[in-house]
Amino acid sequence: MCMCVVLVYFSILLDKGTKVLYTHDNNWLVILVFYFLAFGSIMRISGRTCSEEMKKSFGQASYHNGLQNFSKESPVGVNLEKKKTHISCCIILATQRFLQKFSNKRLGNPHLHPTRESTFSRELATENNSGNFPVLLRYHIFRQLDIENGILLCQVLQALIIVQVMFS
């Protein structure tokens, strides 16, 4: 929402308050507003989905115990809520799930071609009862690589949209 307000404010400054937001000269601004709204919604939905997946895998109690142990080992001044948000946020989880289901259908039997994620899921399932928290950290180190790739992809797409609209 803040991004929309900033974009509208800059559009008024650029147009010196003489044009309406929806004129043909400001099409790029409308595209950017809807792009940022959609991107924010995807982040919220995928973050919620990732935390639900964790709670299913580890159980409600072990999920919160693991987060508390993680916060005890962290430097002073780090908020547990920030860590919880960071851990549960996964930008491209929905895309991963879709691609995994699609590739499993194309390959036939998913057990013949295990993905990295299915290997991690089996590892989590076998060590779930022992309450081994480093498994949780390994799982999220793997997830962090995908998060960084997702952020990079979104930044590239954003730059391409801006360049395309500015030079068209």
From Swiss-Prot:
Membrane topology value: Multi-pass membrane protein
GO cellular component, one term: membrane
Keyword Transmembrane helix assigned: yes
Keywords for the protein's UniProt record, in alphabetical order: Membrane, Transmembrane, Transmembrane helix
Regions crossing the membrane: 27-47, 147-167
Main location as per UniProt: membrane
Subcellular compartments: Membrane
Name by which UniProt lists this protein: Putative uncharacterized protein YLL059C
Annotated organism of origin: Saccharomyces cerevisiae (strain ATCC 204508 / S288c)
